[in-house]
Design a protein with these regions (language model features):
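Switch/coupling sub-region of P-loop NTPases
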Residues: 1-109, 121-122
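NTP-binding/hydrolysis catalytic cores, primarily Walker-type P-loop NTPases
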Residues: 125-168
């Protein structure tokens, strides 16, 4: 697989780890924006996009873009403590970067590109290990909440309608 890497600072050094792989590494400079790097990578034959560290709003935007159109899959690092924190942080980055104006749409886009969260931790010797793997399954909201319970005359009727609504 061909690797396409975008970093804000060269720190992955994957050519040392995978010397026989076809690797294209790019980073933002004073004259070349990170978005331009990503646009070039979209035009290359890359199977895997790796975003060095998603620590700023623009970099989060690049990650979402590359995951949607640029490769078979995208890997990235982030320092969120939990999976819900990761979704919230990426959603907020999309909003602050101006990519989306609506929280719901931004969160849906984030959740669509996150398949798994592989959370690493360090042991007391400083070695990393996989603490947990969380699968992200988008919830498809097919039913809207109705207010039929309001027209019921009795409390039992209201409760029955309310729970029917909540469980279907």
């Amino acid at each position: 697989m061909n690797l396409r890497i975008t970093e804000t600072a060269f720190e992955l050094h994957l050519r040392k780890v995978y010397p026989t792989r076809n690797i294209l590494s790019m980073r933002e400079t004073e004259t070349i924006a990170g978005q331009e790097c990503l646009d070039v990578q979209k035009k290359t034959d890359g199977s895997v996009n790796i975003i060095g560290e998603v620590a700023t709003d623009p970099v989060a935007s690049w990650m979402i873009q590359s995951a949607q159109v640029a490769s078979k899959f995208t890997l990235f690092t982030h320092h969120a403590k939990t999976f819900p924190d990761l979704v919230t942080a990426l959603r907020n980055s999309m909003l602050r970067a101006g990519v989306f104006k609506d929280e719901k749409t931004a969160e849906e886009q984030v959740v669509q590109v996150l398949n798994f969260d592989i959370h690493l931790q360090k042991d007391f010797r400083g070695r990393r290990y996989i603490e947990r793997v969380t699968e992200c399954i988008p919830v498809v909201d097919q039913k809207t909440y109705d207010h039929d319970y309001k027209s019921e005359k009795t409390m039992d009727g209201k409760v029955e309608k309310f729970f029917q609504n909540a469980t279907t």
